[in-house]
Design a protein with these regions (language model features):
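Acidic/histidine-rich alpha-helical segments that form the ligand environment
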Residues: 258, 263-267, 303, 321-361, ...
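A metal-dependent, Asp-based hydrolase signature
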Residues: 44-92
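Short, acidic loop-to-helix structural element flanking the phosphoryl-transfer center
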Residues: 61-66, 81-84, 91-123
Length: 398
C-alpha cells in the first residue's frame, strides 16, 4: 500500500498570506473587466459568488457551476461570452501577483524527499480557484506540476465542496482513487480549513503552525514546522496513519460526497459510453446509476428508518444485482436515474444528520452479518459507494 501525503497549498507549500492575496486578486480581476461592470460592483459580485461556492452543498453542481450561476447573470452576460477575457486574465494578469508570495525551499525539499520514498503527494488546496490559478501558484512555490508528479490537485472545475466542508475530503479521496486502506496524512496551516474538517472526515492530520501558535482544535495531533513534519515522518510508522470513517461525521461526509463523485463522471463521460458494457456480464455506467438509485431508495433508506423506528429489528440482506436485468437498467434514462439517486441520497443524508449520538448506536440484527448497529450499517453504505464509484470510473475509461 502506498502512503499518501495531502498538502495544503497557500501558507503551507507557498508563503502567500492568502487573506491579503485574495483582495488584490479580486481588484485586478475587477479592473480587467471594468468595461463590463464598474469595479466596485464587480468586487461585490465576486465576493458574493465566492461565498456561494464556500457555502455550497450541491452534489450536482461543481463549484465553477455554482460560481457561474451567481456571477454572470447580474453582469448581463454569460460564461461563454467572457471566457476569452477570463482566460486572458489568468494568462497575463494573474501571474503579476507572484511578488506578493514567496516560495518555501524547505517545502520543495520535503516534497522531493517524500517522492523519493515512493510516497504519493497530492495538493489538497481549497478549490475556490480555477485550475490555471492553482497551477500558477504551484509554479510560484517552485513546485511546477510539469516537474512534480502530483497525484491530484483540487480545483473548482472538478470539485463540489470548499475545504471547510467535511465532504471535501471524501470527494478528494474518491478522485485520488484511494482504496480505503492505504495510510495517509493531511498537512495544512488552517485550523478551519485543514485541521477541523480533515479530523472530522477521519483523516490523520499534521498541523503546520508558526511558533507560539496553539489551538484547542489541534490538541493531541502532531504539529509544528515543516522541519518538525519531516522529523515526525522519519520516526513515525506511517503505515499506522490510517483513516477512520467510523464516526458519524465521517460517515455522513462520505455519503454526502459520493453523488458528487458520480456527478463528475456524468459530466466527463460521452453519451455513447453510458450504455456500453465493458465485457459480457458486466454493468454499463447507466446500469450502475440505476443500481445506486434503487439501493438508496429501496434498501438504505428503509433500513435506516427500520433501525430508528424499531427495537433491534431484523435487517434482511438483499441481493440487488439481479435488478439490473429484471428492471432493464440498460434501457433506462441514465441522466434521470442520476437525478433520482441525488434526491434519494439527499433524503438519506438529511435523515442521518439529524439523529443523536445514541441513535447511531441503535442495534439491529442483519441476516448475513449478525448483530450490528446503525453506525456499522452506514459504514456498509460507504463501502458500497466506494466500490461502485471505482467500478464506474473503470467502466467509463474503457
Amino acid at each position: 500500500m502506498i502512503f499518501h501525503l495531502l498538502f495544503d497549498l497557500d501558507d503551507t507549500l507557498l508563503d502567500s498570506n492568502i487573506e491579503s492575496l485574495v483582495p488584490v486578486y479580486f481588484q485586478k480581476l475587477a479592473a480587467h473587466l471594468a468595461d463590463v461592470l464598474p469595479p466596485q460592483e464587480m468586487l461585490q459580485e465576486l465576493m458574493r459568488s465566492t461565498m456561494a461556492m464556500y457555502r455550497s452543498t450541491r452534489v450536482d453542481q461543481t463549484l465553477e457551476q455554482v460560481f457561474s450561476e451567481q456571477f454572470y447573470p447580474p453582469l448581463g452576460t454569460t460564461q461563454e461570452a467572457l471566457a476569452a477575457r477570463i482566460e486572458q486574465f489568468y494568462d497575463e494578469v494573474f501571474p503579476t501577483l507572484q511578488p506578493l508570495t514567496r516560495s518555501r525551499p524547505e517545502a520543495v525539499s520535503l516534497v522531493e524527499w517524500a517522492l523519493s520514498r515512493g510516497w504519493g503527494v497530492s495538493v489538497a488546496t481549497d478549490p475556490l480557484f480555477p485550475r490555471k490559478a492553482i497551477l500558477h501558484r504551484l509554479r510560484w512555490a517552485e513546485l511546477a506540476p510539469e516537474n512534480y508528479p502530483f497525484r491530484l490537485i483540487s480545483d473548482f472545475q472538478t470539485f463540489h465542496f470548499a475545504k471547510a466542508s467535511v465532504a471535501y475530503f471524501g470527494e478528494f479521496l474518491g478522485h485520488l482513487g484511494w482504496d480505503g486502506e492505504s495510510p495517509l496524512l493531511m498537512v495544512g496551516d488552517s485550523i478551519e480549513r485543514d485541521v477541523i474538517p480533515a479530523r472530522q472526515a477521519g483523516i490523520p492530520v499534521f498541523w503546520l503552525k508558526a511558533d507560539g501558535q496553539s489551538s484547542p482544535a489541534a490538541e493531541g495531533i502532531p504539529q509544528g514546522t515543516l522541519s518538525d513534519l519531516k522529523a515526525f515522518l522519519e520516526r513515525a510508522d506511517v503505515s499506522a496513519l490510517k483513516a477512520d470513517f467510523s464516526s458519524p461525521a465521517a460517515l455522513v461526509a462520505a455519503l454526502h460526497a459520493a453523488p458528487a463523485l458520480i456527478h463528475h463522471l456524468t459530466r466527463v463521460t460521452p453519451p455513447e459510453k453510458w450504455n456500453r458494457r465493458p465485457a459480457p456480464g458486466e454493468w454499463a455506467f447507466n446500469e450502475i446509476l440505476c443500481h445506486l438509485r434503487d439501493v438508496d431508495a429501496e434498501v438504505n433508506l428503509p433500513r435506516v428508518e427500520a433501525v430508528l423506528g424499531g427495537q433491534n429489528p431484523v435487517v434482511a440482506g438483499q441481493n440487488t444485482d439481479p435488478w439490473a436485468e429484471q428492471r432493464h437498467y440498460i434501457e433506462q434514462d441514465g441522466a434521470q436515474a442520476f437525478r433520482e439517486f441525488v434526491a434519494a441520497r439527499a433524503r438519506l443524508v438529511e435523515k442521518l444528520k439529524t439523529i443523536s449520538p445514541q441513535e447511531w448506536e441503535r442495534p439491529a440484527r442483519h441476516t448475513i452479518f449478525g448483530p450490528t448497529h446503525l453506525r456499522e450499517l452506514a459504514g456498509f453504505m460507504v463501502e458500497h459507494d466506494r466500490a461502485h464509484f471505482k467500478q464506474a470510473r473503470e467502466t467509463v475509461s474503457i
